[in-house]
């Protein structure tokens, strides 16, 4: 019997087949005529893709039926190489919780009066409770950048 195969370009080719022929045989005949390897061919009939091991009779393909030939798309993206790091991973800093740590900012003098050891930043943007870092020659606020430099004794102005 004779069947038609419509290719991607719209060209229709005729094939002489038997209803007992497998889809593999049909693909081999298409390769002979068109030069397309069977592993890249996909044959569609009545909206279904034809599987290689089955026969034309399994799909009820009769004489003068038209099969549609489309090419197989090899999907997926290129495999990505695993990154190799030159340096070992940096260990994350673990916060140490110290109980009653706030006590280091205050001192109780002999009369029982509480005295602040660190200078508090007077800037309005910092808010209450922001202490200034005390360096050997200055007080510095890390939040707003305000700096008070100590006046050295005997220094000329």
Swiss-Prot record:
What CDD domains would the database entry show? Ubl_ubiquitin (cd01803)
- InterPro entries linked to this entry: Ribosomal_eS31, Ribosomal_eS31_euk-type_sf, Ribosomal_zn-bd, Ubiquitin-like_dom, Ubiquitin-like_domsf, Ubiquitin_CS, Ubiquitin_dom, Ubiquitin_ubiquitin-like
Location of cross-link Glycyl lysine isopeptide (Gly-Lys) (interchain with K-? in acceptor proteins): 76
The signal sequence is: none
Q: Name one GO biological process term.
A: ubiquitin-dependent protein catabolic process
Family matches, as SMART domains = Ribosomal_S27, UBQ
Keywords of the record: Cytoplasm, Isopeptide bond, Metal-binding, Nucleus, Ribonucleoprotein, Ribosomal protein, Zinc, Zinc-finger
Q: Which GO terms describe its molecular function?
A: mRNA binding; structural constituent of ribosome; zinc ion binding
**Which Gene Ontology cellular-component terms appear in the entry?**
cytosol; cytosolic small ribosomal subunit; Golgi apparatus; nucleus
Highest taxon in the source lineage: Eukaryota
- Please state every residue range assigned to the domain named Ubiquitin-like: 1-76
Q: Which family does it belong to?
A: In the N-terminal section; belongs to the ubiquitin family.
Database matches in PANTHER family: UBIQUITIN
- Misc note: Ubiquitin is encoded by 16 different genes. Ubiquitin is generally synthesized as a polyubiquitin precursor with tandem head to tail repeats. Often, there are one to three additional amino acids after the last repeat, removed in the mature protein. Alternatively, ubiquitin extension protein is synthesized as a single copy of ubiquitin fused to a ribosomal protein (either eL40 or eS31) or to a ubiquitin-related protein (either RUB1 or RUB2). Following translation, extension protein is cleaved from ubiquitin.
* Protein name as annotated: Ubiquitin-ribosomal protein eS31y fusion protein
Organism, per UniProt?
A: Arabidopsis thaliana (Mouse-ear cress)
